[in-house]
Amino acid sequence: MNSRRRFVKQMGRGMAAAAAYPILSPLQSCNGRSRTATQVETTTTSELFFKISLAEWSLNRALFGGQLDHLDFPQYAKENFGIDAVEYVNQFFMDKARDKAYLGELKARCDDHDITNVLIMCDREGDLGDTVPLQRRAAVENHYKWVEAAQFLGCHAIRVNAAGEGTAEEVAQCAAESLTELATFASDYNISVIVENHGGYSSNGKWLSGVMQMVALPNCGTLPDLGNFCMKRSDPLEQTTEAYMATECLEEYDRYLGTAELLPFAKGISAKTYDFDADGNETSIDYGRILRMVNETGFTGYVGIEYEGHSLTANEGITKTKTMLERIGSGLT
């Protein structure tokens, strides 16, 4: 299947949604180095109840466009934003998962600059909720190399997607079985497998929390993305990432309800931002409300900045997001 067809298939899965998302019984079965002049000080966040990391996707345009190299991302994050923890996206080093020389160079750069590797976001490795057994097995095994890479880099987790085609019940059961298998494998590496609400069924908090209840393993959890509760989108005008990002949400799950449903299983938070008002607040997400919810659960892990707006440059958006999180978070400790 060529890349164009793969894109259409992947995007289509992210647009599917169903009218009902029941929680299934576990008994059901699935068939089928030196500082630069521009370097900023790393902000001390000890007064916050959470830690701040930077998701590599925030800089996707620079990375895809060749203005920024994946190996330079960690140092770039620290020198430009004062962020010393990073979240990788496998798309930017897709063929390097088992390249120990490459991974060793990446790890050495992080060690040299006191940067923490938090997780690897994994895409394009098949559908963990696939209802076809052989394809589902391939998807599970395709993620093994990222578990190994995550351990090598010192990450605590890999982020995966619970996608699949079929009814809500079928995809949930198959995703649960895949996650059980993958998390069992990952436990030998001290790696967690965390699922993001990432379109389709997974953007329904009740559905995804139900999958978590079915898996019920300590190293399997969620990565609530505060902006990813769209269950159905309009069709992209062309088959590019930019065109998909410009699509309109046609059906959206309540983000505050969804966040509440996913937080009990959270092993990370993805702080999605798009635009800001004159007071520096995100215009579409009430971060004061969200962070109070997060704080009430006792969460103390990483909140990863993921800027996806277009009105600001990526650097401006990242900086505004960090400032907002620190301002709101400091008032909740």
Which residues does each PLM region occupy?
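Active-site acidic/histidine proton-transfer and metal-coordination neighborhood
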Residues: 11-24, 37-47, 75, 109-224, ...
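Boundary/entry segment of secreted carbohydrate-active catalytic domains
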Residues: 45-69
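Hydrophobic faces of well-ordered beta-strands that scaffold small-molecule active sites
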Residues: 50-56, 84-88, 117-122, 158-160, ...
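Charged helix-capping and loop-helix junction motifs
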Residues: 68-72, 100-105, 136, 140-143, ...
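Acidic/histidine-rich catalytic cores of soluble enzymes
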Residues: 85-86, 176-292
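N-terminal twin-arginine translocation
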Residues: 1-6, 18-37
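Catalytic domains of carbohydrate-active enzymes, especially glycoside hydrolases
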Residues: 69-89, 154
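Glycine-rich, proline-tolerant flexible connector loops at the mouths of alpha/beta enzymes
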Residues: 87-107, 165-166
